[in-house]
Amino acid sequence: MEDFSLDGNHGHVPVMRDRMAALIAENVEALGENAVIVDATLGAGGHAEFFLNTFPKARLIGLDRDQNALRDARARLAPFGERFIGVQTRFDGLREVLESVEGDIIDLAREHGIAGALFDLGVSSMQLDQVERGFAYRTDAPLDMRMDATQGITAADILNTYSHGDIARILKTYGDERFAGKIASAVLKEREKEPFTTSARLVELLYDAIPAATRRTGGHPAKRTFQALRVEVNNELDSLKNVLPQITDALNVGGRAVFMSYQSHEDKLVKKFFTDLTTSKTPPGLPVDLPGTAPQFKQVTRGAETASEAEIEENPRAAPVKVRAIERIANNSGDLS
């Protein structure tokens, strides 16, 4: 979830805001007052506010595990009154929200399905700006990194308790860190002297562990390790795996789900799921789809879309975003309505 450029009193304009609205516009506008949008990564509420302004008849369900973000978003979206409901949960709590939470908007979603959904993955600019959260590596801060600060393990817990093998695996898998084993060895050696508590000590360790030639060409040496720790702390990949079938099940015919990924491992998961879901199950060689084997979804984006050069120039945080969208074209019985 990456933001860029200033937006009045609310911090940042969301990445690719206009394109996100355009991707869900047709079905949302067609459903009118029956349209329910899900912003599953509500953050500061920038995308949600734009959607509610752009589609004045639509309702919106906003999800966020971060209680501070949810508080601020509720205040920002208060002028929309009963057109908005915010729920504190991880985004893979979507199914439980639709099944268990009471409210007129939830009832509407149960009856008509979801018209459009947005998943803006990763950490938000708001969270990066809150130094005490420990997401940023350029300022010394507690090694926390929890998106929900009320529960779960911290980055310090991982560094101080995980085995060499587990630390190396996390850094390699979630951060594409070439020197994962060397860094893991250095962590175990350092924690014998004193437990890790703040980010500056970890950054210093990474400067020492990563060769100078790599530091000169590979960006900030802490970037990949901090990313990997954040993904592990917040169980981000499992949440993504869990929510993909939840949202596609919840879409109505014509409904679209849009995913904005900032890391390769996220985009690969989304790409594979979309490919599987849009591929016919009819055995190869047959001229037509057998009953019950035709795909119920189609991919809306051709490959992954990216931010424009102008947007990237205004804020480099938009540079890595990859956008993929999928649309339900038939219901579970194969009907087109």
Curated annotation (Swiss-Prot):
S-adenosyl-L-methionine binds at residues 45-47, 64, 91, 120, 127. GO terms for molecular function: rRNA (cytosine-N4-)-methyltransferase activity. Coiled coil: none annotated. Its main location: cytoplasm. Gene3D superfamilies: Putative methyltransferase TM0872, insert domain, Vaccinia Virus protein VP39. GO terms for biological process: rRNA base methylation. Keywords: Cytoplasm, Methyltransferase, rRNA processing, S-adenosyl-L-methionine, Transferase. It is an enzyme of class 2 (transferase). It catalyses: cytidine(1402) in 16S rRNA + S-adenosyl-L-methionine = N(4)-methylcytidine(1402) in 16S rRNA + S-adenosyl-L-homocysteine + H(+). Belongs to the methyltransferase superfamily. RsmH family. Specifically methylates the N4 position of cytidine in position 1402 (C1402) of 16S rRNA. This is Ribosomal RNA small subunit methyltransferase H. It comes from Corynebacterium glutamicum (strain R). The gene is rsmH.
